[in-house]
Amino acid sequence: MEGTGEMREVGRETLHGGVVQSVSETDEYKEKTIDSEKDGQFRVQPRWRKFLAHVGPGALVAIGFLDPSNLETDMQAGADFKYELLWVILVGMVFALLIQTLAANLGVKTGRHLAELCREEYPHYVNIFLWIIAELAVISDDIPEVLGTAFAFNILLKIPVWAGVILTVFSTLLLLGVQRFGARKLEFIIAAFMFTMAACFFGELSYLRPSAGEVVKGMFVPSLQGKGAAANAIALFGAIITPYNLFLHSALVLSRKTPRSDKSIRAACRYFLIECSLAFIVAFLINVSVVVVAGSICNANNLSPADANTCGDLTLQSTPLLLRNVLGRSSSVVYAVALLASGQSTTISCTFAGQVIMQGFLDMKMKNWVRNLITRVIAIAPSLIVSIVSGPSGAGKLIILSSMILSFELPFALIPLLKFCNSSKKVGPLKESIYTVVIAWILSFALIVVNTYFLVWTYVDWLVHNNLPKYANGLISVVVFALMAAYLVAVVYLTFRKDTVATYVPVPERAQAQVEAGGTPVVDASAADEDQPAPYRKDLADASM
């Protein structure tokens, strides 16, 4: 480690895949990465401590799997189709783990997050298009948070849902303000409430004792029987795999200090994979328990007429019905508090994801409260209109619709991610396994085909059964099919366009750049990377968790 003490902070430092901002001083680096060095003996940091240093990004992403949109789609799937759609959750979670791992790896290997790489690679007009799609994804995901929080206020304060929608503006700003006094403490409280809700569903599950054979069949035997099964499956998939999480995860890993050697980068990728897997397993079990509880109660033979009516139009407002065996009369209060925590925690991740997207695509940043206010006001408009016109039932349908929209927006974040992960111009020799990439591409195109087929089938079915004049149907068809064609053209463009911008910097070139900058030439540039301060993103170091 000789000579490193003379180094000072530099404005821009070369990293695998390009340039990152602000490297901390070497003294600070040594203090945080070395346990002790006495009498010439260097003690290596234990692996468990290295792993704990990487905990956080996957957990924050996994919290999004417990948001109001997931709860709503899980309950609807269970109430309408019992255990038939459990396989969608299994496939969705495996796919989510795969692509979120790719997103984390991309950030670690390149020193940039996905939105920044898109800005550097694509023409300006393409970036504007991708930015708009990404922002729409954030807004689409914020709508369920608005309605979930409004339902929580409705249960706790006995106010109309539309009034709760208006209150969500102030509640979220208050939460962001409180976060300034201790983000980790706030997140711990939110996580405690959410795991309380998870414990309630697990307890209800043990009380109901569903048929293990039926649950296993629903999880491993794909089936889409019955009217609305395809729509529910797409909504389930969209609620699990959200586009903004790809941008968020690739940015969160940059707040950790990762040395620049290939060995250290691969080790960091392994730690992030383990952390993400553990968080996703917990989220998977909770989602399965919600579906099974809803399916067991709403499809029971001894269901009362009142409960049957509730299950026929199950919303977040009527969910306490599913927990009464465990919590009794207190089920409403406990569930409402947990639902409130769920909506608020996901709002925080949405806000930070929005910051990452705006900074990456447009190279601009705004204060968290301003960013949250803009997103929330836009999300409130449809939520308020639907809750006034259609009440709780319409609000529940809007949550399902927003999840379906997320599924259609996913390819515009997913395709650039898959291309960059396997591009030698972006990650050099650190490309992903060919098997991983092939599986990811197959699943991605299967999703695109299913989405397109469902959209065409739904529109044709509506066209056949509506009572509009022929000229009106003709005009609408022209617009709809033009949008479908534009959607497919955009997907094809992103898929087959070759990467042109090289951001990966090989080791010899990095060593030469160091010499040209006035540094000391080294014999083994790769080994020298181990001794240098680990560059990291100070602009992302204040990320939640």
From Swiss-Prot:
Entry comment describing in which tissues the protein is expressed: Expressed at low levels in roots.
Keywords: Cell membrane, Ion transport, Membrane, Transmembrane, Transmembrane helix, Transport
InterPro entries linked to this entry: NRAMP_fam
Broad class of where this protein is predominantly found: membrane
Residue ranges of the region described as Disordered: 516-545
Induction field: By Al in roots. Positively regulated by ART1.
One example GO MF annotation: aluminum ion transmembrane transporter activity
Entries under NCBIfam families matching the protein: nramp (TIGR01197), Nramp_1 (NF037982)
Family listed: Belongs to the NRAMP (TC 2.A.55) family.
Function: Metal transporter that transports the trivalent cation aluminum (Al(3+)), but does not seem to transport divalent cations such as iron (Fe(2+)), manganese (Mg(2+)) or Cadmium (Cd(2+)). Involved in Al tolerance by taking up Al in root cells, where it is detoxified by chelation with organic acid anions and sequestration into the vacuoles.
Protein name (database record): Metal transporter NRAT1
